[in-house]
């Protein structure tokens, strides 16, 4: 099974922080959520996913399937529920719940349209602390993600975008 969070966990383990606070935009089937929480005992994680039907790069994702994903995700992370909060909403509606420069990392793996990835970058980048990790998934495999991330990076003068073997893109703020 492929879990996109493997590359992210390796990066976060390099920090010397006693406590980590982060956001996962797009929790999906919960594999990455579980991996983050089980691998990083010092992590408080906020998940943002509306679990509603939508069309994306991989076709139609019916609401019934996503409702099943929600149930599975919550069952998987039950042992870690004291360190996890799920906002069942779209990322645009949740961004104001977080103070600027309050988070150690953000992992963007939600709606993969060019417009939404760019908007998530613009909305959530200010939430990262200086020295925090700004990251996401599907940089090499989905053109819309690649274009949006590259455009945003250029806009804020990020000259190098790091990548892991698990197709996680990142840079340090």
Residue spans of the language-model regions?
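S-adenosylmethionine/decaboxylated-SAM
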Residues: 6-173
């Amino acid at each position: 099974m492929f879990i996109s969070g493997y590359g992210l966990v390796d990066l976060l383990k390099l920090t010397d922080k006693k406590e980590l606070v982060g956001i996962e935009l797009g929790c999906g089937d919960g594999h990455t959520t579980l991996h983050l929480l089980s691998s990083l005992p010092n992590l408080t994680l906020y998940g943002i996913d509306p679990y509603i039907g939508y069309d994306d790069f991989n076709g139609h994702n019916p609401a019934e399937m996503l409702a099943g994903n929600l149930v599975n995700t919550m069952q998987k992370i039950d042992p870690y529920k004291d360190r996890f909060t799920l906002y069942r909403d779209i990322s645009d509606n949740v961004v104001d719940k977080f103070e600027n420069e309050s988070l150690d990392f953000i992992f963007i793996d939600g709606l993969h349209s060019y417009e939404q990835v760019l908007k998530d970058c613009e909305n959530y980048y200010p939430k990262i602390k200086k020295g925090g990790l700004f990251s996401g998934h599907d940089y090499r495999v989905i053109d819309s993600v690649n274009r949006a991330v590259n455009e945003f990076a250029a806009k804020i003068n990020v000259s190098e975008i790091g990548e892991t073997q698990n197709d996680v893109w990142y840079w340090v703020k």
